[in-house]
């Protein structure tokens, strides 16, 4: 299984070699790593409230408040109507409640719950003889479930979930669509409620909605609900959700932006995990279309498509090769070089870093795709969040690359930006840059030993000229033990010549390369 970022440095703590296991260099996404899930998605799209079919709420805010107050004054009347035995009165009053719950801002969800009508609405869901009443009750409950977790819990506790699932086979299009929406809101509340809905068998019933007769509004709602069934941490059981893959494989060929967006988000959730999940996503036949969507004009589609491609290349070399073979790399070059926003460039760099963590053939393909120059440009000039991912991409290439590949990286100017990041506040990135520089120094040393450079490690000189030597010296006083030890090791290996050691020192005062390193006070200084 691929290691997460914090495990990667741990695994490498005691090993300093150029060729590392590709699995070790790959990084699954951390929850907080990429801020692509914008507030808008978090706040608005996990739950959706259905507003009025005609936007009658055109009042100014103060007028709207007084209008609402007047509406609430009629609550006792509406409650009585809902609990009456008169079907037409039940419908009329349920519709009024639904309208109250559909106002644009701050609908009175709490007041409606307190009025005690929720169990009655759940009863109305069973009225197969009166689809219009079912529809209005389902709409009202959908909007109650769009509120807080407590609001959602009320809807669940009155036994609505199995009834909503049964309504997915209603002969009424409107009732089915409203049931889909309600289940999406309930599942979108939390992993706990998502699993409750899935546990009642909702997925199979939901997947049945994706048929040739489905209206676009149903496709949009059902795809959104499907994405909520797949999202959240802890993740749903893959055994439950993988049945969605064939449907998602069809949905990503839609021309509708909303359907595409939510289908790609669902795939991004399903591909976020172990290699068996990644393999199932690959076998759903989605890779070719995902690469096409990396060129989509809408960021709302591009972002989850890129997220999914990025997840797939956290897999093993064979899985990563699938994305390479589908020509993902030219699309990634485009994302690095064109005018895309920070979060997209960052995600693209993260994706590339997991490809450069692959084998030497894959590193060569990255080089031949022309990715290194734009990567180095971002490493030097981009915002820090992008620089961090670019540093991983370059460092991983130095870890797995051969002699000529690493020389090519140096020829593209990677040394100075790696040196510049040695003073960044993120200790993991400092370590990543030190590892990259160390791998480069090893190649310089090999060239020196071959007699190609007149007895000089040319890359050590370049690091010195880039003010890297001074920065590495300063890292000897770093709080992080791994950074401090690695800095000492690099200095000792590539800059400490015999003539620099005072003759008066006894041999046993320093034990370089052993388990213990005894340092002079203040560390080494070669300035």
Curated annotation (Swiss-Prot):
Forms a complex with importin subunit beta-1. It comes from Solanum lycopersicum. One of its GO terms (cellular component) is cytoplasm. Pfam families: Arm, Arm_3, IBB. This is Importin subunit alpha. Belongs to the importin alpha family. Keywords: Cytoplasm, Protein transport, Repeat, Transport. It is found in: Cytoplasm. Binds specifically and directly to substrates containing either a simple or bipartite NLS motif. Promotes docking of import substrates to the nuclear envelope. Seems to act as a cytosolic receptor for both simple and bipartite NLS motifs. ARM repeats lie at residues 109-151, 152-196, 197-234, 235-279, 280-319, 320-362, 363-403, 404-445. The keyword NADP does not apply. InterPro entries: ARM-like, ARM-type_fold, Arm_3, Armadillo, Importin-a_IBB, Importin-a_IBB_sf, Importin_alpha. Residues 1-58 form the IBB domain.
């Amino acid at each position: 299984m691929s290691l997460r970022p914090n495990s990667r440095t741990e695994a490498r703590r005691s090993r300093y070699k150029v060729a590392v296991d590709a699995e070790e260099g790959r990084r699954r996404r951390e929850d907080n790593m990429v801020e692509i899930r914008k507030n808008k998605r978090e706040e608005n799209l996990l739950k959706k409230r259905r507003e009025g079919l005609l936007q009658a709420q055109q009042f100014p805010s103060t007028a709207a408040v007084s209008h609402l107050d007047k509406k609430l004054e009629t609550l006792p009347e509406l409650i009585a109507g809902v609990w009456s035995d008169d079907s037409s009165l039940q419908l009329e009053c349920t519709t009024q409640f639904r309208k109250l719950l559909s106002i644009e801002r701050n609908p009175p969800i709490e007041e409606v719950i307190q009025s005690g009508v929720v169990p009655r609405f759940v009863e109305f869901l069973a009225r197969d003889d009166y689809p219009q009443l079912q529809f209005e009750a389902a709409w009202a409950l959908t909007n109650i479930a769009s509120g807080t977790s407590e609001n959602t819990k009320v809807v669940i506790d009155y036994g609505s979930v199995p009834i909503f699932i049964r309504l997915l086979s209603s002969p009424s299009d409107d009732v089915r669509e409203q049931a889909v929406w309600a289940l999406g809101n309930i599942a979108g509340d939390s992993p706990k409620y998502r699993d409750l809905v899935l546990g009642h068998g909702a997925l199979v019933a939901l997947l049945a909605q994706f048929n040739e007769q489905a209206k676009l509004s149903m496709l949009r709602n059902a795809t959104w609900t499907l994405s909520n069934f797949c999202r959240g941490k802890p993740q749903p059981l893959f055994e439950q959700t993988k049945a969605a893959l064939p449907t998602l494989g069809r949905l990503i060929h839609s021309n509708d932006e909303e359907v595409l967006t939510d289908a790609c988000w669902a795939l991004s959730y399903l591909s976020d995990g172990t290699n068996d999940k990644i393999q199932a996503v690959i076998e759903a036949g989605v890779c070719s279309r995902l690469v096409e969507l990396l060129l989509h004009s809408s960021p709302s589609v591009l972002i989850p498509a890129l997220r999914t491609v990025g997840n797939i290349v956290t897999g093993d070399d064979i899985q990563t090769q699938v994305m390479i073979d589908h020509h993902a790399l030219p699309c990634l070059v485009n994302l690095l070089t064109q005018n895309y926003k920070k979060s997209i460039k960052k995600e693209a760099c993260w994706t590339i870093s997991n490809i450069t963590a692959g084998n030497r053939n894959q590193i060569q393909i990255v080089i031949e795709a022309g990715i290194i120059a734009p990567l180095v440009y971002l490493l030097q000039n981009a915002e820090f969040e992008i620089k961090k991912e670019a540093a991983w991409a370059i460092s991983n290439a130095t870890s797995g690359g051969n002699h000529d590949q690493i020389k090519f990286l140096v020829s593209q100017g990677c040394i100075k930006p790696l040196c510049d990041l040695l003073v960044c506040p993120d200790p993991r990135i400092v370590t990543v840059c030190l590892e990259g520089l160390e791998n480069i120094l090893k190649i310089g040393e090999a060239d020196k030993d071959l007699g190609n450079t007149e007895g000089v490690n040319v890359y050590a000189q370049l690091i010195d000229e880039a003010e890297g030597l001074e920065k590495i010296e300063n890292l000897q006083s770093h709080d992080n033990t791994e950074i401090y030890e690695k800095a000492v090791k690099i200095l000792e290996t590539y800059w400490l010549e015999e003539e620099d050691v005072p003759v008066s020192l006894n041999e046993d005062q320093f034990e370089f390369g052993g388990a213990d390193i005894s340092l002079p006070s203040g560390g080494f200084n070669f300035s």
